[in-house]
Each structure stands twice: as structure tokens, then as C-alpha cells.
């Protein structure tokens, strides 16, 4: 072999066998510059180097495992510029694609199975253009290594493969001692220690040749990968008779999810891979039964303690997660894999994990199984998609983590066995605030360490889960010292706390504690400045509560602020007395009227059933309701009080022949005549319509004593909020361009217009009362004509 000053390339061909009587022949082929020129000639001649027929120039195919007609032959791939095909195996020279530094030798490592040679292969010439390269015999396991070499497997034909990471290469000395090619870095076919084991497991030990290219370790990412958002190496090669795993370079391994890998004493890549599979995310993915999994095998940066190797096919460490979304049909189906970053997987695992959980464990495996997150999964054992748990995952022989069991929260879940499930979490997780139960589940039958996560749904009837009770505050609260046993609704106490002055709060609470009749009677019997006529226990409780609510005010028994509160209470009582005495004066002077005017009441509970009679005074001329509708004489300041002003009754309508409809939302149970609603819709603006409808909703006696929102300082109560809300909804429906929300500008204008109309009505009533006091009592002309001196029924008020 001639020495060269330039860059030299070598090809190492190794024949492996467990027979001690045979020797190994390793052919080192020097790739010179003339090899590049003769690449096309070599490809056309298809020169092969065989172990069975060393002197034959024709192509001979070895007996591959499962070499029947249905078995796929190794895939012929052409990534480089030059290629040499040997015994059905094609190796490639990628040196033309990537720049190589000077002085760096490139080695091409071709590893052949034991069935290709009998250890004592006679020297065979290797045709490389016009050169004949001599053969060099080496020991069976002696290999030439490069610092950046790597072993790969051939894929099956027609498969799509995703990359898999292998770690660093173990030294040759260790391979000579152990007689095995399995290590955490390079996983190849295991050579049996004895001849009997090899004969027994001949079908398992055979595999395709493996090829190593030093230039395959260059950093490169393809532009047209199957997954555009994830980097894929340009020179990934997959292999193995039963495996569909691929290899990626260490340069791209930093973007992958680190997971646990095989220990040094575990056997082969095909039978014992420490891989993590990730299935596809898209929707409506239908895959047939028996389809192989395509998975990523990422470069591990985490350690896993050693464990005795088992050659069974089920000895895997797999993180198993089912499909995320979509409709997947078919039994035992699998989908393509997608690289998912750790932060994406953690977010899905922590916050979006509905569904039921099961544990899929077979013969010494560490399995994490998560069911489908969404979509319809109709198969009994649907395809599983695989997501990483965490970037700092470690696996030991006995699972020494603290296992956290999330209680299963499902609808109508009475199964005690499914009430809780354990999940192994590392400190990197950001846990949501959940009620958890600590429970360790151990299964020593197959030495299985299971990690299972429960679902979080609405209701939970399981016995192992903890339920949170809703604390409903009590309806009533004590006023002052609880020993006084003075209770009011808490809503009133909250309203008092929002008031600015204790005087307003005192008037509000007095109106709540005492009825109107008690306040009026107390103020009539004694002097108005003396409030001791009221219940002293309630008044003391009122003062104590005000002192607690307004600590900066002087609310002692003789304090300044408390005296102001008493003055405000007396002013309110005086207003109530004056308003109550105003209407009965006219009634006493007109005892012959059929219906007397009821006493004014601002109490909200007394509004229903309170209406003025027809012609409550001689000034109010009775008018038929039908005549008023014909004349449309429904002005707010009219002296006549028609029957239409009475509150509508849903049980007994005023006119059975009149069409009625709901006012506002139907659940408010407020009905109004359709003619009234039609007239209200014809108003030019919302404020005029509200001013018209307020007289149809309430009687005149209620309006003169009330206000829209009330004013306790002046003795005015708020109108029925249910009817006010119905009015606002009606206006909002018929005037959509107006801002008629609770705090809307147009609704405030409507409230101002309603209050203005009520003030006008109140002023007219007072002016009528003043005129009636100045004039003598006059009997109406109708009664004078009917009454005669000798008629005994003349003085009967019933006539």
C-alpha cells in the first residue's frame, strides 16, 4: 500500500464468526484520488467482494436472515458522489459532500455477519478501478476505529425512517474481552460466547451488514424533511431485521429529548432498545393492523444504573403515550413519530390529560401509559403515541422515587381499584394545585415499575379521592353584640359598609329594623326628638354596629356623631308621618265615596294590592279605561287616575277581551296590555317611553311615595326592581342604538326622566290637597240629585 501525503480513505471489511478454528480476514481498501474518477465505472461493473466465492468476479448474494421472497433486501441508498456495491451491500463515500480537513483519514467500516465467511477466507482481490489491493489478515475482533466513526444499520426497503441516537463508541479492548458488540454507545448484533448458544439463536444473531462512514458525522440538516418544523440529519440510515429504528448524528442530538438508554450489559439493539417512541399528532389517521412503529431514538444525556441483561424481546424501557387527537381505528396500530420538545410534552401531561389510564407492562419493563387525549378511539388496543415525561428522567432497578398518586376524578366512578393511580414526577414539573393522595403501588410479579396517571374530570364518587366542600355563608348576620339577638340580612350589612357616613347607615338600618307603622306610631305618641320609644335593645345594637363599622366616628351614647344619627332618624320619621297624614284628610271629608283612598305606603311588600279607588276625591273625575285609550289622553300630570294605572294582575286581567303580552323577559312574569306596549314603541326616544310606562307599571299612590332607586334620607323607597329591570329590557329591545345597560348613559337619562315625572306627580297631589283644605266640603252634584230628605238610604255610604 503506497503512502500518500494527501488525504487517504480506507475501507475496513470485518467478517465475524464464533468459530475459533477460523481466522478473520479484514480487507483495508485505500480510496485514492483515482477512485473518484472511476466511480462510475465501479458502479457499472458492480464489482463485489464475497466471502463464499473470493475469486468470483460476479455478484453473489449471501443468505440473509429470512431470505425468502417476501423478505426485503437492504435498501440501496446513494447519498454521496461515489459508491461501491459489495455482496448486495452498498457503502458510500460522502467526502465529496462535506469538506474534510487535511490529514484526516476517512475509514469505511463494513461489518459482515458470521454466515458470510468461515474465518479462514483466502485472500481475494478487490477490484477498485484498475488497482488490485492486497489483503491484510487480522484477528477476528480487531478493528480500525476513527474518533468520529459510528455504526449504523440498513433499513428495509420502502420504509420511512426517523433518526436514532447512539452514544460514544467503546474501546476495542473491551470488545475483545466481552466478545460482544453491545454498549451504551454502539449497539450492534451480539456475538455469542459459545458455539452452542450461537447455533440455538442463529436466527436472532444474524442481521444485515453495518457500515460506518466518518463523514456521516457532519452537522447537516435536510431542508425537505417529512416534518418541516424539526431538524433531521441528511445521512440517517436505519437497519435491523425486526427494528425500524434510525440513527442521527451527535451534532443533532442536542435538540432531542434525553431519555434513558441501555446499560452496558444489555444485549442487542433489535431485542433490547432503550428508545422512546412518539406517535403522530394529526387527526383522522387510519392505520392498519400490524404496521410497524417508526420512532426516534434520542441521544441520552442522563444516566441509568446497570441492570442484568435479558435477551428477551420484551425487556424494554419505553415511555408509552397514546394519540393526542384525531380518530384512530384499527387494532394494535401505530402511527408515525413526531419530535416533540420537552416543554410541549410537559404542558400536555400536566394540564391536558383526560381519559382513563391503564398500565401496559410486559416482562421487566418500565412503562408509562397515557390514553388518548381527544378524539374517538374505537379499537380495543389503539395506536399509542409517545411523549417524553421530563428531560431529567432516571430509571433504576427499584424505582426509588416518591410516587405521587393523583386521585381519579371521573363521573360515576365507583370502582375502588381505579380510584387512584400513581405518577412519577420529578422536581422539574410545575404541578397544578390539586387534591392528591399519596399511594405507592408495587407489583413484584414481573419486577415492573409502573407509572400511571389518573384523569381529572368533573365529578368523583371514588372512595380514595378527597372532595372539597363548598362553604355557603349564613343568610343572616348579627347586628352588634350577638347576645342581643338582633339579626338582619347580610346583604343589608354589606350595603351599610359601603356608605360614607354613619347618619345614612343609621336611617337605612332603622328602616330595616322597624316597620312603617311602628315608626309612625312612635313619633305620634311622644316628641320627635325622643327616639326612646323605639326598641332600646335594637337601638343599642344599631349603635354598637355603627361604632364597629365607623371606628373613627364618635358613636358613644352621647357622642356627636350618634346625635347626628338620631336627628336623621327623627327627620325620616317626620317625613313618613307627614306623607301618611296627607291622603286621609281628603278621605275624611268625603265619607260618601264608594272607594276611599288607601293610605300611602312606601313599603315594597305593600305595593301589590294597593290601589286607589275610582274617584278617590271629588276632584278626580272617574273615566272609563276604554275612553282614555280612544282619546289617548294619558298625560303623566293628568288629574284623572284611570284603572289602567293599576298594577296589571296576571290572574285577573282588567279586561278579558284585551290582548296581553309579557313585559320584559317572560320569567319575570310581568304582563302588559298590547295596546300600551304598542303606544310605548311609538315614542321618539327611550326616556319618553320610560316615563309613559312607569305610570302603567305602578299606581299613583305608590309613585308619590317612591323613587326609582329610593332615598331613605327623604323617606322614599325604591320601586320594585323586578319591574324596573323589565322596563330596561323592554327599552333595550326597542331602542337598540341606545346604551341602556345598568350604568349606561341613556338609561341614566331614563331614570332622570322617571324621577322628574314622579316629582311632578307629587307636586300636583300636594297642590290639590292645599286647594281642598281652603274650600269647604262640597257634595258632588250626582249625589245631591240622588239623595232625598225622606230616603233612608241617602246617608248609606254603600249607595
UniProtKB/Swiss-Prot annotation:
Predominant location: nucleus
Top-level division of the source organism's lineage: Eukaryota
One Gene Ontology term of the molecular function aspect: DNA binding
Protein localization: Nucleus
Keyword annotations from UniProtKB, A to Z: Nucleus, Repeat
One GO cellular component term noted in the UniProt record for this chain: nucleus
Domain BEN, chain residue ranges per copy: 483-582, 667-765
Region (Disordered): 32-73, 584-616, 629-656, 768-799
Comp. bias regions, Basic residues: 586-595
Listed Polar residues bias regions: 34-63
InterPro entries found in the cross-reference section: BEN_domain
Record field: compositional bias (Basic and acidic residues): 603-613
Pfam families with a match to the protein in the record: BEN (PF10523)
PROSITE patterns the record matches: BEN (PS51457)
Annotated coiled-coil segments of the chain: none
Protein name: BEN domain-containing protein 2
Gene name as annotated: BEND2
Amino acid at each position: 500500500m503506497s503512502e500518500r501525503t494527501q488525504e487517504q480513505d480506507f475501507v475496513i471489511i470485518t467478517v465475524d464468526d464464533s468459530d475459533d478454528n477460523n481466522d478473520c480476514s479484514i480487507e483495508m481498501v485505500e480510496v485514492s484520488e483515482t477512485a473518484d474518477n472511476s466511480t462510475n465505472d465501479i458502479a457499472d461493473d458492480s464489482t463485489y467482494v464475497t466471502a463464499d466465492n473470493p475469486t468470483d468476479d460476479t455478484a453473489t448474494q449471501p443468505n440473509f436472515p429470512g431470505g425468502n421472497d417476501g423478505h426485503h433486501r437492504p435498501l440501496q441508498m446513494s447519498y454521496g458522489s461515489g459508491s461501491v456495491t459489495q455482496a448486495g451491500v452498498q457503502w458510500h463515500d460522502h467526502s465529496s459532500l462535506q469538506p474534510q480537513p487535511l490529514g484526516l483519514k476517512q475509514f469505511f467500516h463494513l461489518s459482515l455477519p458470521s454466515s458470510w465467511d468461515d474465518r479462514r477466507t483466502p485472500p481475494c482481490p478487490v477490484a477498485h478501478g484498475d488497482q488490485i489491493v492486497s489483503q491484510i489478515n487480522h484477528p477476528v475482533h480487531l478493528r480500525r476505529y476513527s474518533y468520529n466513526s459510528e455504526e449504523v444499520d440498513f433499513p428495509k426497503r420502502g420504509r420511512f425512517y426517523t433518526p436514532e441516537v447512539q452514544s460514544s463508541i467503546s474501546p476495542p479492548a473491551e470488545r475483545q474481552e466481552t466478545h460482544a458488540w453491545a454498549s451504551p454507545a454502539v449497539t450492534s448484533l451480539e456475538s455469542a460466547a459459545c458455539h452452542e448458544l450461537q447455533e440455538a439463536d442463529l436466527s436472532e444473531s444474524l442481521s444485515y451488514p453495518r457500515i460506518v462512514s466518518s463523514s456521516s458525522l457532519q452537522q447537516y440538516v435536510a431542508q425537505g424533511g417529512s416534518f418541516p418544523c424539526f431538524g433531521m440529519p441528511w445521512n440517517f440510515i436505519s437497519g435491523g431485521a425486526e427494528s425500524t429504528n434510525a440513527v442521527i448524528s451527535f451534532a443533532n442530538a442536542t435538540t432531542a429529548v434525553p431519555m434513558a438508554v441501555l446499560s452496558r450489559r444489555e444485549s442487542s439493539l433489535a431485542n433490547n432498545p432503550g428508545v422512546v417512541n412518539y406517535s403522530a399528532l394529526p387527526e383522522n389517521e387510519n392505520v392498519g393492523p400490524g404496521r410497524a412503529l417508526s420512532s426516534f431514538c434520542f441521544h441520552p444525556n442522563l444516566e441509568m444504573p446497570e441492570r442484568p441483561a435479558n435477551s428477551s424481546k420484551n425487556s424494554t424501557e419505553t415511555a408509552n403515550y397514546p394519540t393526542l387527537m384525531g380518530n384512530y381505528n384499527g387494532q394494535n396500530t401505530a402511527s408515525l413519530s413526531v419530535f416533540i420538545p420537552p416543554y410541549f410534552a410537559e404542558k400536555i401531561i400536566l394540564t391536558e390529560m383526560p381519559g382513563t389510564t391503564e398500565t401496559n407492562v410486559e416482562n421487566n419493563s418500565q412503562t408509562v401509559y397515557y390514553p388518548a387525549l381527544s378524539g374517538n378511539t374505537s379499537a380495543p388496543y389503539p395506536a399509542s403515541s409517545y411523549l417524553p415525561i421530563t428531560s431529567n428522567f432516571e430509571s433504576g432497578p427499584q424505582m426509588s422515587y416518591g410516587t405521587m398518586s393523583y386521585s381519579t376524578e371521573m363521573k360515576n366512578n365507583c370502582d375502588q381499584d381505579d380510584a387512584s393511580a400513581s405518577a412519577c414526577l420529578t422536581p422539574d414539573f410545575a404541578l397544578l394545585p390539586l387534591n392528591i393522595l399519596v399511594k405507592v403501588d408495587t407489583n413484584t410479579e414481573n419486577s415492573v415499575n409502573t407509572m400511571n396517571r389518573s384523569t381529572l374530570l368533573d365529578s368523583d364518587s371514588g372512595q380514595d379521592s378527597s372532595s372539597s366542600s363548598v362553604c355557603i355563608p349564613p343568610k343572616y348576620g348579627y347586628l352588634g353584640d350577638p347576645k342581643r339577638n338582633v339579626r338582619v340580612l347580610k346583604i343589608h350589612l354589606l350595603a351599610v359598609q359601603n356608605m360614607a357616613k354613619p347618619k345614612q347607615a343609621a336611617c337605612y338600618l332603622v328602616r330595616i329594623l322597624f316597620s312603617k307603622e311602628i315608626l309612625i306610631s312612635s313619633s305620634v305618641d311622644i316628641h320627635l326628638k325622643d327616639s326612646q320609644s323605639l326598641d332600646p335593645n335594637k337601638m343599642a345594637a344599631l349603635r354598637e354596629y355603627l361604632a364597629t363599622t365607623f371606628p373613627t366616628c364618635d358613636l358613644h351614647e352621647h357622642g356627636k356623631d350618634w346625635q347626628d344619627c338620631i336627628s336623621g332618624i327623627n327627620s325620616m320619621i317626620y317625613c313618613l308621618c307627614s306623607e301618611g297624614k296627607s291622603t286621609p284628610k281628603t278621605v275624611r271629608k268625603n265619607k260618601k265615596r264608594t272607594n276611599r283612598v288607601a293610605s300611602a305606603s312606601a313599603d315594597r311588600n305593600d305595593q301589590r294590592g294597593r290601589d286607589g279607588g275610582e274617584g278617590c276625591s271629588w276632584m278626580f273625575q272617574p273615566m272609563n279605561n276604554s275612553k282614555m285609550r280612544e282619546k289617548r289622553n294619558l298625560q303623566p300630570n293628568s288629574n284623572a287616575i284611570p284603572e289602567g294605572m293599576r298594577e296589571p294582575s296576571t290572574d285577573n286581567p282588567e279586561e278579558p277581551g284585551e290582548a296581553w303580552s309579557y313585559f320584559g323577559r317572560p320569567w319575570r312574569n310581568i304582563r302588559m296590555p298590547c295596546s300600551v306596549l304598542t303606544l310605548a314603541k311609538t315614542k321618539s326616544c327611550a326616556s319618553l317611553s320610560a316615563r309613559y310606562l312607569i305610570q302603567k307599571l305602578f299606581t299613583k299612590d305608590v309613585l308619590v311615595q317612591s323613587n326609582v332607586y329610593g332615598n331613605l334620607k327623604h323617606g322614599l323607597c325604591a320601586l320594585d326592581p323586578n319591574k324596573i329591570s323589565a322596563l330596561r329590557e323592554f327599552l333595550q329591545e326597542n331602542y337598540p342604538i341606545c346604551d341602556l345597560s345598568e350604568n349606561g348613559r341613556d338609561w341614566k337619562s331614563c331614570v332622570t326622566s322617571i324621577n322628574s315625572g314622579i316629582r311632578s306627580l307629587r307636586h300636583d297631589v300636594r297642590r290639590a290637597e292645599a286647594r281642598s283644605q281652603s274650600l269647604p266640603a262640597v257634595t258632588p252634584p250626582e249625589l245631591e240629585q240622588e239623595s232625598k230628605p225622606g230616603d233612608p238610604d241617602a246617608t248609606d255610604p254603600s249607595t
